[in-house]
Structure formats: structure tokens, C-alpha cells
A protein has these predicted regions:
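Short, charge/polar-rich alpha-helical segments
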Residues: 1-22
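Short, charge-rich amphipathic interface segments used for partner binding and complex assembly
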Residues: 16-67
């Protein structure tokens, strides 16, 4: 069973990770807009999609921790 302290620590880490991923998604969006190479743009898009999926999973984890 997870203690309240452990839950709080996990929540703090998830929130920090969420913020970091949000920034990376924004960075990739900017790169995607200025990229002139189609292959590079496709790789950037794919990376952004993977980060969005990770972000959604983190949000679900936060919701689960909050009950």
C-alpha cells in the first residue's frame, strides 16, 4: 500500500515531468514549423506524437494519484 507521503512525492515528480514534456512538445512544434526537410519534419512530428502520448499517460497517473 502506498503511503500519503509516497503519493505526494510521486505526484510532485509526475507534475515536474509533465511540465518538462509540455516544454519539449512546444519546442518540437517550433522546430516542425521551421523545418524545410520533409523527412526531418516527419521525424519531429513523430517525436511530438510520442511525447503527447507520454503526457496523456502522466496526466492519467496524476488523476489516479489524486483519487
Amino acid at each position: 500500500m502506498i503511503t500519503e507521503s509516497e503519493r505526494g512525492e510521486a505526484l510532485e515528480r509526475l507534475i515536474a515531468l509533465r511540465s518538462s514534456i509540455e516544454k519539449r512538445i512546444a519546442d518540437l512544434e517550433q522546430l516542425e514549423q521551421v523545418s524545410e526537410d520533409e523527412e526531418e519534419t516527419a521525424r519531429i512530428y513523430d517525436a511530438r506524437i510520442y511525447l503527447i502520448i507520454a503526457f496523456e499517460n502522466i496526466v492519467l497517473g496524476i488523476k489516479e494519484l489524486l483519487g
